[in-house]
Design a protein with these regions (language model features):
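Carbohydrate-active catalytic/glycan-binding domains of CAZyme proteins
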Residues: 1-533
Length: 533
């Protein structure tokens, strides 16, 4: 029997994958939107097992996310390698300072990466780079069509890039508007040169249920491009909302050192109805070339949960520990913040063995950088626990755990203060789902549970069984008291809340608009995935 692996290769909120190979090593990056650090970079030797090297943008000077709205920030990146240098090109959307398309470079994929080279006169999103064998470099991206006739009418455009000056030169040209008649949201372009032909692969249909991957080719880089008559080369839009994998699209291709071809792409796994709290995830699917065109998932034409393993030597990496005791000098790379931190709101040194969060006025509902340290929900079933030492000094102060979809859709499970500490479980959402991905609709707070509690050391537990989330509190280890069980988690899914991101769970502290000198100390945080493979 051939070996198989389990999709997705990166579970949880890891959308818009881009991949490149250097020798026997593979590198992959994903979009991160309003989260900091930005753009995780992963390394693999077998395309199945991945380890995170760090982030492309890990310094505040590189990434001004100040004021970025929910699902703004860093959109789809592309990673490429050329003559000893790695390049990542990306788009920063929204915010109150810099925005637009930019390039960063490194000679080591683990970093450090350069400060951004911002590109002028480069409208649109989803930029990609192509290095031709004649030494010329090209920028390819998407933008609203110059003769826009309908909503979602975009075009793929090309312009030469001067690598020495990091600027676009020459005249831009339009390559394609997509395969479908009146195609919508032609985006995510990538160029490849194979056997003397230029291939332009894009996504269209929008990054939801109608998502698809299409391809065209030309003998000249500037076109004209002829579409594959068998487009789309991969989509699940015809399989219904109850299919186990939906929204397939936004792909990139890689050839192994042994001549096999593989595609990475995003997709979603709905559960509890057409809801996907884990967000858009990274999947891997084989392809082969027939009559000059790629055939994706030969024999089925579908992205599968179980797929044959690439013909590469297996290379596993040490597993990420389930429990973080905060005994190192830096946070593990799976931890993230909301937007760019402009002051030191967290510390691993103030109290060794603890993660200290300063209480600040910023709240989850603000388009700011609250005192939040979180990680992705990566499983439909999971258990998360944490130990917190905290003495609230005023009624406005709180600390605990939160489940975050965005600033208007989240669940706060916190200790609040004054003379008598209280456990508060608060859901922020809207009564009905958001009918569109953007913009995010303002929500309101609803208190789900409230009970007094004594002490200054608290144990939190959150369990998810599909869309049912349960919350427990204790003042002694394992002496759990139910706060609320079976809470509806669908508000944490983009089909309900809107936007482009997946659910985070993490640690949070706030003085809710008031000044404070207080802090909250987290002794440890544990996350256990309970999905059956």
């Amino acid at each position: 029997m051939p070996r198989t692996f389990r999709n997705p290769i990166l579970p949880g909120f890891y959308p818009d994958p881009s991949i490149c190979r250097v020798g026997d090593d593979y590198y992959l990056v994903n979009s991160t939107f309003e989260y900091f650090p930005g753009l995780p970079i992963f390394h693999s030797r077998d395309l199945v097992h991945w380890r995170q090297l760090g982030h492309i943008l890990d310094r505040p000077s590189q990434l001004p996310l100040d004021g970025v709205y929910a699902s703004g920030g860093l959109y789809a990146p592309t990673i490429r390698y050329n003559r000893g240098t790695f390049y990542v090109i990306n788009t920063l959307v929204g915010g109150t300072s810099k925005s637009g398309n930019f390039i960063v470079t490194a000679t080591d994929p683990a970093g450090p990466w350069s400060e951004p080279y911002w590109l002028e006169n480069a409208p649109g999103i989803d930029p990609s780079l192509f290095f031709d064998d004649d030494g010329r470099a090209w920028y390819v991206g998407n933008r609203m069509a110059t003769d826009s006739r309908y909503d979602g009418h975009t075009e793929i455009w090309l312009q030469e890039l001067d690598l020495a000056a990091m600027c676009l030169v020459g005249e831009p040209c339009v390559l394609w508007e997509g395969a479908a008649r009146d195609a919508v949201w032609a985006e995510a372009p990538h160029l490849y040169k194979i056997n003397g032909q230029y291939y332009l692969m894009i996504a269209e249909g929008g990054t939801s249920h109608d998502h698809a991957v299409t391809i065209a080719r030309s003998g000249e880089i500037t076109g004209p491009y002829k579409a594959n008559r068998r487009n789309p080369i991969i989509t699940h839009r015809h399989l219904g909302q109850d299919y186990q994998i939906v929204g397939t699209g936004h792909a990139d291709l890689v050839e192994t050192q042994f001549g096999e071809w593989w595609m990475v792409l995003l997709a979603m796994r709905p559960y509890g109805g057409y809801f996907y709290n884990l967000g858009r995830e990274t999947f891997l699917v084989p392809l082969r070339w027939e009559e000059g065109w790629p055939v994706v998932a030969p024999g089925s034409g579908r992205v599968a949960l179980a797929e044959r393993t690439p013909d590469l030597p297996e290379q596993r990496w040490p597993a990420v520990p389930a429990c973080d005791h905060f005994e190192t000098q830096t946070l593990a790379p799976h931890w993230n913040f909301l937007r760019t931190p402009r002051d030191d709101f967290w510390s691993l040194c103030a109290r060794p063995g603890y993660l200290r969060l300063r209480l600040r006025p910023e709240r989850l509902t603000d388009l700011a950088n609250p005192s939040f340290v979180g990680r992705r929900q990566q499983h439909m079933r999971f258990s998360a626990r944490a130990a917190l030492e905290f003495r609230p000094q005023h009624d406005d102060e709180c600390a605990g755990l939160v489940l975050v979809q965005n600033n208007e859709f989240h669940i706060r499970f916190v200790i609040t203060g004054g003379a008598t500490p209280t456990v508060h479980l608060v859901k922020r959402s809207t009564p009905e789902s958001n009918p569109q991905l953007m913009p995010i609709i303002p929500g309101t707070d609803v208190t789900l549970a409230e009970l007094p509690i004594e002490g200054s050391r608290f144990y939190f537990k959150v369990e998810a069984d599909g869309q049912a989330y349960s919350f427990y509190i204790a003042t002694e280890p394992e002496s759990w008291h139910p706060v609320a069980e079976g809470v509806d988690g669908r508000i944490l899914s983009t089909p309900y809340a809107g936007g482009f991101v997946g659910t985070y769970i993490g640690m949070y502290a706030s003085s809710n608009g008031q000044p404070s000198t207080n802090s909250a100390d987290f002794d440890w945080f544990e996350y256990l995935g309970l999905d059956e493979n």
